[in-house]
Amino acid sequence: MFWKKKSLGYKLACELPLNTPIRDLSFTVMDTEATGFSVGAGDRLIEIGAVHVDGLSVTDHIFQTYVNPQRAIPEKITELTGIQKEDVADAPAAVEAIEAFCHYVEQCGSNGWVGHYLAFDLLVLKKELQREKYSFNEPPAFDTLDLIGFISPSWDMRDLEHYARSFGTNIYERHSAVGDALTTAHLFVELLRLLESQGKTTLNDLMVVTKKDGSFLSL
């Protein structure tokens, strides 16, 4: 469950044995766009994008919604993302958009969320829910940066496009939530393949590599 004070009744997935092969897992790879980085202050969510990964395949099951931030979008953010006030004027409010996203996650039967620098995206959602008195219970989640840190520990930067080029994976429209989710998904699948080539083939291996504890199994 994601919410405690106001329950919307969504279930992410079920408990999984630690020896579950990575190839048998499914993931929701997601990204957000916001009016800025100060989401704990006045910046707001303006887009959610996601794609479903089944095993080691990026599917065509995509989710996208703009979000009405109930404030102006700074010009520099419009220049960066291409999102204009007309795009969000009739878009759902944040909680409604997050609710739709969680319906998508549930439909996919996802075993966890994935993102590139995912901590920021989770913070964006958490702050939006807190504004409406919802409590956010973070989902089982994996960050491509943690996988990269294991596979290539000498690399220390966050740029998604840099890593996609380095690992030879597809690059989609940048600073678009769907585009970045697709870029992240293809990078994630390649990183999983590299893990498998090193003998890391199970959920337990993935948890160890990304420094997750057993709380992942308490869904």
Labelled PLM ranges:
Residues 1-18, 189-219:
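Acidic two-metal-ion nuclease catalytic site recognized across multiple nuclease folds
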Residues 136-142:
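Short, acidic/small-residue loops that bind anionic groups at enzyme active sites
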Residues 126, 185-192:
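Short, amphipathic alpha-helical segments that act as regulatory/interfacial helices
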